[in-house]
Design a protein with these regions (language model features):
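A short acidic, Gly/Pro-enriched loop at the edge of an enzyme's catalytic core
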Residues: 74-82
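Class I SAM-dependent methyltransferase SAM/SAH-binding core
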Residues: 31-70
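S-adenosyl-L-methionine
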Residues: 1-17
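Short alpha-helix
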Residues: 126-140
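Core SAM-dependent methyltransferase catalytic element
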Residues: 152-175
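A short, conserved alpha-helix within the catalytic core of class I
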Residues: 89-100
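Conserved beta-strand signature within the Rossmann-like core of class I S-adenosyl-L-methionine
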Residues: 105-112
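Class I SAM-dependent methyltransferase "Motif I" SAM/SAH-binding loop
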Residues: 26-28
């Protein structure tokens, strides 16, 4: 697994409030934890894989081991200046993920979509977004950018979203 952050996350990281609190959900070995922490952000890393999570201990401000698909939501009532989700989809969590975005905060989401089965794994439609599904999940947020197509290196079918929760202030500065 590459340690390089997703270009989508890197593109939008500058719009996260300085010294902000960031949730990296289903963080895996922590490529985004490391990248975001290096930018001075306080990252909460959540994953079910203890060994993967251990790779970001000492870097993340907080590490939470949780099986997001079997356990109760591990962050009730908590909100973050940004929520980052990449290469992960569990539809029952979509409302909780959006609810974690604080006023003035960002949701950065990038994962596989229908059509991915032509490029490789995942190929199970239960783990692939339907057309427009990520936009539906962001209801109540202001969409700053949305992409739905084939990303390169490696080729994969994805949907990407950057969305902001208005707080009555100006939207984040775009990079």
């Amino acid at each position: 697994m590459s340690d390089t952050p997703s270009p989508w996350v890197a593109r939008w990281a500058g719009a996260i409030a300085p010294y902000g609190r960031v949730l990296d959900l289903a963080c895996g070995p922590g490529r985004h934890v490391r990248y975001l922490a290096s930018r001075g952000l306080r990252v909460t890393a959540v994953d079910r894989d203890r060994e993967a999570l251990a790779q970001s201990r000492g870097i993340a401000a907080e590490s939470i081991e949780a099986d997001l698909e079997a356990d109760a939501w591990p962050l009730p009532g908590r909100q973050f200046d940004a929520v980052v989700v990449t290469n992960y989809l569990w539809r029952p969590l979509l409302p909780a993920i959006a609810a974690c975005v604080a006023d003035g905060g960002l949701l950065l989401y990038e994962t596989f979509a229908l059509g991915q089965e032509h490029f490789g794994r995942p190929s199970n439609p239960h783990f692939l977004l339907r057309p427009g599904e990520l936009l539906e999940a962001a209801q109540g947020l202001h969409v700053l950018a949305y992409e739905d197509g084939v990303a390169a290196l490696p080729d994969r079918r994805v949907q990407r979203l950057a969305a902001w929760r208005p707080r009555g202030a100006d939207p984040p500065r775009l990079q």
